[in-house]
């Protein structure tokens, strides 16, 4: 039996972190934790409860009443309701960076994941600060990259499959805006750490990326 390790996958919005992580988790029988979905759940929670998303104090206070759970098949439940597909809506995509830039929100998510993984192996965690904040001691660190144009097209295709109609130019604008926010935020800005392996997946198929990462693990 091969010894399991912990894998952290970082990278910008829409690069395919979750898709790749899910496939790797399935192939290696690992547990996948999508940090982005937790941030999206917080955004959903704030909107659902008519909280002003720009009022940091109220957003932070709302964390005390947040009830959610992750299933083994990577579905997310909010107070018993499966909101996995709802979390991919455009409204949630636009609102998530507003809440995720709040330091207390980031600490909440980081603490949640670290408690789940403490003293354990066989986890694959993705996010935009996973390699240096959430899982700084991960055995394998990957930084996925792709051009904004490629990521925008992938997002449009993904939304179409989920039943959402998206305009390419609008999605591209939002992705570039998100990149700027992530790379320039005051706390834990997105960046590649020295010990992370860079994989430019702009012209790679998903299975090629998956196999590349698995080869690095083994």
UniProtKB/Swiss-Prot annotation:
InterPro entries: Cytidylate_kin (IPR003136), Cytidylate_kinase_dom (IPR011994), P-loop_NTPase (IPR027417)
Family matches, as CDD domains: CMPK (cd02020)
EC number: 2.7.4.25
GO terms (BP aspect): pyrimidine nucleotide metabolic process
Domain of life: Bacteria
Compartment list: Cytoplasm
CC terms in the record's Gene Ontology section: cytoplasm
Binding site for ATP: 11-19
Principal subcellular localisation of the protein: cytoplasm
Single GO molecular function: CMP kinase activity
EC main group: transferase
Catalytic activity: CMP + ATP = CDP + ADP; dCMP + ATP = dCDP + ADP
Keywords carried by this UniProt record: ATP-binding, Cytoplasm, Kinase, Nucleotide-binding, Transferase
Family: Belongs to the cytidylate kinase family. Type 1 subfamily.
Protein name (database record): Cytidylate kinase
Higher taxonomy: Bacteria, Bacillati, Mycoplasmatota, Mycoplasmoidales, Metamycoplasmataceae
Gene responsible for this protein: cmk
């Amino acid at each position: 039996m091969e010894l399991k390790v912990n894998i952290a996958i970082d990278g910008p919005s829409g690069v395919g972190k979750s898709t790749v992580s899910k496939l790797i988790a399935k192939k290696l029988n690992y547990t996948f934790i999508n940090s982005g979905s937790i941030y999206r759940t917080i955004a959903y929670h704030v909107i659902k409860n008519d909280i002003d998303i720009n009022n940091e104090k109220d957003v932070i206070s709302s964390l005390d009443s947040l009830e959610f759970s992750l299933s083994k098949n990577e579905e997310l439940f909010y107070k018993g309701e499966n909101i996995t597909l709802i979390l991919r809506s455009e409204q949630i995509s636009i609102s998530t960076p507003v809440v995720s830039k709040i330091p207390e929100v980031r600490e909440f998510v980081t603490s949640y994941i670290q408690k789940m993984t403490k003293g354990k192996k066989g986890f694959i965690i993705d996010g935009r600060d996973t390699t240096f904040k959430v899982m700084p001691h991960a055995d394998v660190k990957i930084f996925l990259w792709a051009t904004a144009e490629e990521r925008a097209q992938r997002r449009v295709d993904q939304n179409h499959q989920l039943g959402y109609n998206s305009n390419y130019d609008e999605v591209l604008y939002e992705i570039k805006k998100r990149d700027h926010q992530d790379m320039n935020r005051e706390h834990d800005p997105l960046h590649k750490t020295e010990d992370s392996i860079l994989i430019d997946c702009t012209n790679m198929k998903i299975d090629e990326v998956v196999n590349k990462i698995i080869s690095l693990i083994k």
